[in-house]
Amino acid sequence: LTLSVYVVDRAQIKAKEAIQKEEDSVIFSALIAAADNRGDQKVTNVGTLTTTSLNTAFKYIEQHDLVSTKIIVHANQYASIRIFGKDFYDEATTREILTSGLFGHLWSADIHVSSRMDSDKVLVVASPDTIGAFPIRQDITVLPADDPKRLRLGWVIYEEIGVVILNDY
């Protein structure tokens, strides 16, 4: 009985994780569409990610009296950040790297690595409360959907959400 409960719990956890990854894809698509629609907030970089292109992206946000709080990258772009070099990072970041082994923060922004992010794009965004909203009408819900006649356990996992970009810069 313990094993079957563990399997059910594990399956439900994996299903919730899949929904959360899909949320990431939807949010990234909305942010990229807003940037593409505006047109003048894009930084073109050929080859690996550079400090100059990141600095330009930060400038585009800061010129509107906002603070860049998140850098969202695919693992391919995160690899470029790791090789910026020891002379690039300040003492606090160097200490963080030595203690945790991670590059989790750059200038004023946290670095988020996601497999759902386009491997050729990097998003630099301001604080979420200045960009838009992520209304949740129905949070992730698990409903039983067993089929006792066939000796099957089942469930339906769903949520109702929205993504709104109010500020496209």
Region annotations inferred by a language model:
Residues 6, 34-37, 41, 45, ...:
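Secondary-structure junction/capping motif
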Residues 33-103:
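Extended, solvent-exposed, turn-rich assembly/linker loops in the middle of proteins
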Residues 86-169:
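Sequence/fold signature of self-assembling virion shell proteins
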